Structure formats: C-alpha cells, structure tokens
Regions:
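A residue-level marker of the well-folded mature domains of exported/periplasmic proteins
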Residues: 2-4, 8, 22-228
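Hydrophobic core
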Residues: 9, 13-18
Length: 228
C-alpha cells in the first residue's frame, strides 16, 4: 500500500489538474495515514499548499496529520518524529533546511515510511521522490520580466539601477532562482544598461535567511540609505 500511496502522491503533485483522479484510483486499497510537514504558516503559500494537500488526501479517504514548524528546524525534526511515532504510511516534507533532516529521515527509512521531499530538496537517500519546479527556469522568467518591463533591448543610452534580493541559503531552490535571474540579466549588467550600485551581486551577499520579509526589507533600506 505504501508504494501505491507514494505513486499516487507523486502523480497528483506533478499534474495538479489530475490530483483527484490520481488519489481516487487508490481509494479502494483501504486508505492510510499521511503525515505532512510544512515549514511555516507565516507565508501564505505554505498555508495554501498544506491545506490543499490535506483536502485532497482526505477527499480520497486518507487520514491526515498536518504540521507547521514556524521556520524552526528543531521543531520540524520533532514534528516529523511525532508523525513517525503516530504510524503514518507516507511523509510529505517541505524542509526548512534541506541538510538538517538527515537523522530524522533515517528514522523514517528505518520505520519503512516513504518520504516525498516537497518543493525543497532534502539531501538524504531516505527520500523516495522529489517534487518541485524547474527552479532555474523560474529565475530566468523573473529576469525576463525585468527585461520586458524595462524594454532593455531598446534602451539605447538609458541606464537603470537594480538591486538583487535572494532567498534562504538553506533552501536548495534559492540558488537556482538567483542564478537563473542573474544569468538572464548578466548581458545587460555587462553592457552597463543595468547597474548594481551597491556592488552586491553574489548570492551570499543578497540571500535572505528563512525567506524572512522583514530581513529583506531592512537590508534593502540599508542599501538605499548607504548607496543612493
């Protein structure tokens, strides 16, 4: 049954429009219990994702335990351990820190519980599936939006100032987002059409711990006060 649960979950998450049929196809297998570990409720997307997954699993006849860990890695480890102790048949985990869950992932593996790494990569061989976007392409689309909005290909002698803000270094996706955007904009930076007045163009300089909006705001306020 666990294998069927994993395959149903992977199919449903990869093809959203087919979510209900994918779950329903295994409903006759007798259901099971799903443990979902989300990073935080402070960002709307995780509320949305957690609620959606819970709704779809319940509609297909599965019991669901949904946890949010308030962006605290130790709390997420504890939440996952509790889900394992509660005897879930499948874990869906959106990691706060993809490198901090190895021990608890091993616990899940030892208990015979498949794990789906949801959106953020968990670097452990205990993970059965990884579901995410093409994150580099997401970054290129962000960069292309800047190009199109400012009409950079027809800028002539016009120049524009730009500053970068990136995501959490602990999130595997953040580097791909940044690299996709930066690589797309680099020709315009090299040509001088775009200028980074602060000089902060490497990922480590522009990253934002835990994707915290207040931290990003304060950094940008400091840049504006110091360089503009």
């Amino acid at each position: 049954m666990k294998k069927k649960l994993v395959l149903a979950m992977a199919a449903a998450m990869a093809i959203t429009s087919c979510a209900v049929p994918a779950f329903a196809s295994d409903d006759a297998a007798g259901g099971g219990k799903i443990g979902i570990s989300m990073p935080t409720q402070s960002l709307e997307r995780w509320n949305r994702d957690g609620s959606y997954l819970e709704e779809q699993f319940k509609a297909a006849g599965y019991d669901v335990e949904l946890t949010y860990s308030d962006n605290e890695t130790d709390r997420q480890v504890n939440d996952i351990q509790n889900l394992i102790s509660d005897g879930v048949d499948l874990l869906v985990v959106a990691a706060i820190d993809g490198e901090a869950l190895n021990t608890v992932m091993d616990e899940a593996k030892d208990a015979g519980i498949p794990v789906i790494s949801y959106d953020r990569l968990i670097k452990s061989d205990a993970v059965s599936y990884y579901i995410s976007f093409d994150n580099y392409t997401v970054g290129t689309l962000q960069g292309q939006y800047v190009i199109d909005t400012l009409d950079l290909d027809n800028a002539g002698d016009k120049t524009y100032n730009i500053e970068f803000t990136a995501g959490d270094p602990a999130d595997n996706n953040a580097g791909y987002f940044f690299n996709g955007a930066y690589d797309t904009l680099k020709p315009y930076l090299d040509a001088g059409t775009l200028n980074v007045v602060s000089g902060q163009t490497d990922f480590d300089s522009v990253a934002t711990a835990q994707w915290d909006t207040q931290t990003a705001l304060e950094r940008m306020q400091n840049i504006l006060a110091s360089y503009y």
